[in-house]
Regions:
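Hydrophobic anchor at the beta1->P-loop junction of P-loop NTPases
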Residues: 8
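P-loop (Walker A) phosphate-binding loop of NTP-binding proteins
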Residues: 11
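Conserved glycine(s) of the Walker
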Residues: 15
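Short, flexible helix/strand-to-coil boundary loops that buttress conserved ligand/catalytic motifs
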Residues: 42, 62, 70, 111-112, ...
Length: 176
């Protein structure tokens, strides 16, 4: 395993954090989650930051946290809206980026009862709006797309491990 940085992207509730933890464990790497890093850095919960300071302030914090996290090897799970910042998308150019996909009904089911600030109110309508606004960013940065709607986490992790290994082999052979 020569990949030093694997980044997971996707919609809220797609499974990025759960897959990230399992993938990092399988690879013997550290897992970081951009939302958790923001909370550690600020000492505040994400909903509080949104309600007090707004989304733009949160996105700036997120961009800074991601930049710092990318300086270290490991698996990094990004928040669902991280790719709305062009600077963040550009920083991912040298990373192996996995787009964690889930169908909208599954995202809605998984997000029920959560305190995600951008899903407040009519969660289905908000998810559809977020999907429309973000859907082009994920494939733009992705090295690999994996579906999590009906797959157990272990199968998703195994698929990523296979692809990362194959990508490493291609990189090694192209450098010969």
């Amino acid at each position: 395993m020569t990949r030093q940085q694997i980044v997971l992207v996707g919609m809220p509730a797609s499974g990025k954090s759960r897959v990230g933890r399992e993938l990092a464990s399988a690879l013997g790497l550290e897992h970081r989650d951009s939302d958790a890093l923001i909370e550690e850095t600020t000492g505040r919960k994400i909903p509080e930051i949104f309600s007090t300071d707004g989304e733009e302030y949160f996105r700036q914090l997120e961009e800074e946290v991601i930049e710092r996290a990318l300086a270290y090897p490991g698996v990094l799970s990004l928040g669902g809206g991280a790719l709305t910042r062009k600077a963040t998308r550009e920083r991912l150019r040298d990373c192996f980026v996995v787009y964690i996909k889930a169908e909208l009904p599954e995202l809605l089911r998984r997000s029920q009862g959560s305190d995600r600030p951008l899903l407040a109110g009519d969660a289905q309508a908000r998810l559809e709006e977020l999907w429309e606004a973000r859907k082009d960013y994920f494939p733009e940065v992705a090295s690999l797309e994996v579906q999590t709607s009906s797959e157990p986490v272990i199968h998703v992790v195994e698929q990523i491990l296979r692809e990362v290994g194959e990508a490493d082999e291609r990189d090694d052979s192209s450098q010969r």
